[in-house]
Amino acid sequence: MTKYTFKPKDFKAFNVEGLDARMEALNEYIRPQLHELGEYFSDFFTSQTGETFYPHVAKHARRSVNPPKDTWVAFATNKRGYKMLPHFQIGMFEDQLFVMFGIMHEAKDKATRAKVFERNFKAIQQLPDDYRVCLDHMKPDKPFIKDLTDDDLKEAIQRAINVKKGEFFIARAITPQDKRLKSDKAFIAFLEETFDQFLPFYSA
């Protein structure tokens, strides 16, 4: 019995038709692990940074018609919410498990906060080859950093700084069949390794 990880069939919750039925599927197959990951990694971030982190599991409460295409747990230092702060996320679409750190378009002082990525441009480029960027958290697209030109990356960061709807996340994503999802031990190791790469950007 696993506590933290997800099986390929869990991702099929996103194929269930209808809002109520999909929410039931998420509650059964995905949210229990997100809550466990929330507890584990809020402690992890608190111990790594010396700041108190809180987990925020997506509730999808505002939805009245369209079922969610993704779900997540986010980590931030505000107990009431995470969108206004730089934050970490573990989440899922039907075809990927993603891990991210960055800034949403709703962030307070977004232009100032996003400059951490401008200042640490070289460090972004030096992340391992399987690291990506996400420029819109509502879409699954996450191009590999290694496939972006310097200008592409600079433009993406500038958009987060200067455009109201601009966002910037560094990210990592794996498929539902990935071997790192086969056990809790492998999954937690993958997540800790990823967050260890993200944390310097949080502290910078």
Swiss-Prot record:
SUPFAM superfamilies: YktB/PF0168-like
A Pfam family of this chain: DUF1054
Database matches in InterPro entries: UPF0637, UPF0637_domain_sf
Top-level taxon of origin: Bacteria
Stated family: Belongs to the UPF0637 family.
Protein name: UPF0637 protein SAS1041
Organism: Staphylococcus aureus (strain MSSA476)
